[in-house]
Curated annotation (Swiss-Prot):
Entry keyword annotation includes Cytoplasm: no
Parts forming coiled coils: none
Protein name per UniProt: Probable F-box protein At3g61730
Consequence of changing residue 101 to A: Loss of interaction with SKP1A
Keyword Nucleus: yes
SUPFAM superfamilies, alphabetized: F-box domain (SSF81383)
Superkingdom of origin: Eukaryota
Composition-biased stretches (Basic and acidic residues): 1-14, 37-48
Length: 359
């Protein structure tokens, strides 16, 4: 009779008993791990689904949620510090230069080559010249406007080139325009202008104290009032003086004929008044604009000659006329002379002088 233990041993020989660690316990751990992975996947899917639901609901409500991102601001560079405004805008500086006087334009041109190009523009100097001379309309010229400006505002006058030793003082009157090629010269400003009859200049002066001259160069003219010593004698003791209304074309000082002395003044007429003269007067009128110049205030002596006891020389300028007036002390009379200068033998008249000298 076999015991149960032997039966058990026999049974144990026919069957393999699985280890404790690799049996049911191992399968349980695998099942747990697979279940955890499934749960993790499910949670991720549920999270994505919830995020999609939140995003869709936010989009419906008009909200846009953005996450945290890195800074994408541009890094500072040399170009970042450069201003977009350019100091070298030609149109801007051309406009600015219209408000500068001659000295300021020269200083601007001395800054650098770029500003020199701007400052040397002929249109800039034309504007400056017309502005400072207060002449509204430009005329065709043969010289550059920068040279014209310099000759008009550098302090030059006709007695710097001729009879320099006779000159005492001068005063700039201004600029006016002669465009009709015919002018009326007169020594009388009291009452209405006396229009001279036809004839020689001497006859016109004797009859009316005025004369007409033709072939005047059209354009801008500059007028000065000159005070010079007695032109008759060379005595150092003579204290006689002569007043001269000196008018010239704006380009006269730039002409070679004037600078080399080949152009000179010629006496075209004179008028002697052998009685006490209350004032020394002289005027130049453009014949085409005579009527409007007469009513511009020139013939209204009280408006510009000062008080009756004022003996200082006075002058007035109009767009197409110029006049001078100086009150005189008691005298024996006055000698008025008319000079003109031509641009060559048969050229146009480029300068006019009306001078008064006490007898």
């Amino acid at each position: 009779m076999k015991t149960r233990s032997s039966d058990a041993e026999g049974d144990s020989r026919g069957k393999m008993i699985a280890p404790v660690g690799e049996g049911n316990g191992g399968r349980k751990r695998k099942l747990v791990q697979s279940n955890e992975q499934k749960n993790d996947i499910q949670r991720e899917e549920d999270g994505r689904a919830k995020r999609r639901i939140v995003q869709s609901s936010d989009q419906k409500n008009g909200k846009i949620l953005r996450g945290i991102r890195g800074c994408v601001s541009p890094r500072c560079s040399a170009q970042t510090y450069q201003s977009r405004f350019s100091w070298y805008e030609q149109d801007i500086w051309t406009y600015i230069s219209r408000f500068l006087d001659g000295k300021s334009l020269v200083k601007l041109g001395a800054t650098n080559k770029w500003f020199y190009k701007i400052a040397m523009e002929d249109t800039v100097w034309r504007f400056a010249c017309l502005r400072d001379l207060q002449v509204p309309v430009p005329f065709p010229v043969s010289s550059t406007w920068i040279k014209i400006y310099a000759s008009a505002f550098d302090g030059s006058h006709s007695y710097l080139f001729r009879q320099k030793e006779k000159h005492i003082d001068w005063m700039r009157i201004g600029a006016f325009v002669l465009d009709s090629r015919t002018s009326l010269l007169t020594e009388s400003l009291s009452g209405r202008l006396k229009f001279p009859r036809e004839g020689t200049i001497e006859r016109m002066l004797q009859s009316s104290g005025s004369c007409l001259i033709n072939d005047i160069k059209s354009g801008i003219w500059i007028a000065d009032l000159q005070l010079v010593r007695c032109p008759v004698c060379d005595l150092s003791t003579c204290d006689g003086t002569m007043q001269t209304l000196d008018a010239r074309h704006i380009e006269l000082f730039l002409s070679e004929g004037y600078k080399d002395g080949s152009w000179d003044y010629n006496l075209i007429g004179s008028h002697k008044l052998q009685k006490n003269a209350s004032a020394a007067c002289g005027a130049i009128f453009d014949l085409k604009h005579l009527k409007e110049s007469s009513y511009s205030g020139i013939l209204n002596l009280k408006s510009w000659t000062g008080e009756s006891n004022d003996s200082q020389p006075k002058a007035v300028i109009a767009p197409h006329a110029v006049a001078v007036h100086t009150r005189l002390q008691e005298n024996e009379g006055i000698l008025v002379k008319y000079h003109t200068m031509k641009a060559g033998t048969d050229g146009d008249i480029v300068s006019i002088r009306i001078s008064q000298q006490l007898l």
